[in-house]
């Protein structure tokens, strides 16, 4: 619990700036919901999903990357919208 609180404090401090910095989730499993501050000019978050030998996989982060066929991607423009 202390680690989670410390992580949230660090993310808050790092993301404080005079403009708005987008915050996106960057976790792969729902058990470890971590976030990242996107760089200047990045205005979207993404969540992409695909199936492999391990089952359904999901990746999250800043931006809106191009994906290969068979990969589903959802992009959005608000803080933590890719959860």
Curated annotation (Swiss-Prot):
User: One GO cellular component from the entry?
Assistant: extracellular region
Q: In which tissues is it expressed?
A: Expressed by the venom gland.
* Signal peptide range: 1-21
One GO MF term, please? Answer: acetylcholine receptor inhibitor activity
State the UniProt keywords alphabetically.
Acetylcholine receptor inhibiting toxin, Disulfide bond, Ion channel impairing toxin, Neurotoxin, Postsynaptic neurotoxin, Secreted, Signal, Toxin
The protein's matches in Pfam families, at most eight in alphabetical order, are given as: Toxin_cobra-type
Instruction: List cystine links.
Output: 24-45, 38-62, 64-75, 76-81
Subunit structure, interactors included: Dimer.
State the protein's purpose. Binds to muscle nicotinic acetylcholine receptor (nAChR) and inhibit acetylcholine from binding to the receptor, thereby impairing neuromuscular transmission.
What family does the database annotate? Answer: Belongs to the three-finger toxin family. Short-chain subfamily. Type I alpha-neurotoxin sub-subfamily.
Entry protein name: Three-finger toxin MALT0066C
